[in-house]
Amino acid sequence: MNGDEDWLTVGKVVAAQGMQGELRINPSSDFPERFTLPGQRWLKERNGEPRPIELLTGRQLPGRSLYVVKFAGVNNRNAAEALVGQKLLVPSSDRPSLAEGEFHLLDLVGLEARLQAEGPAIGHVIDLTTAGNDLLEIELLTGRRVLVPFVEAIVPEVQLNQGWLRLTPPPGLLEL
């Protein structure tokens, strides 16, 4: 597995936690088991190659979207801090199967954003933020970036095969 298409980014190491080598992970996956079930994962620096690492334990922080994980061989705060900023990966083949009409949130990145199904693009989805509600970061054709809540009332239609999604934003949302 060499190309980026062989890997799924499921989170990012955002901080060290405590003195025993635990790490805080900001998830980009809707599947908690990616952070809680022991087993092999991979870490990747910005321009580096993925390298295997063993997940020993993981738990979600109460009331937060962050996870705290413990990897084999990361036994102190200095070792943990050296991993901050790296992406947590799994092989693309580990992608869970979905029911009809469902999709993986990461598949939304790159889609055109439209106001009407047959209308022109107003921008593209460039990123996804997992918070209380998932937020799509859309870069408008003007170059400005806006955050759009990924809820059915605002994003009522997603056409993955055709490469677009439709927005029905409340007044002012795209002007923020």
Swiss-Prot record:
Keywords: Chaperone, Cytoplasm, Ribosome biogenesis, rRNA processing. GO terms for molecular function: ribosome binding. Gene3D superfamilies: PRC-barrel domain, RimM. It comes from the Bacteria. One of its GO terms (cellular component) is cytoplasm. The PRC barrel domain binds ribosomal protein uS19. Belongs to the RimM family. Binds ribosomal protein uS19. An accessory protein needed during the final step in the assembly of 30S ribosomal subunit, possibly for assembly of the head region. Essential for efficient processing of 16S rRNA. May be needed both before and after RbfA during the maturation of 16S rRNA. It has affinity for free ribosomal 30S subunits but not for 70S ribosomes. This is Ribosome maturation factor RimM. It comes from Prochlorococcus marinus (strain MIT 9313).
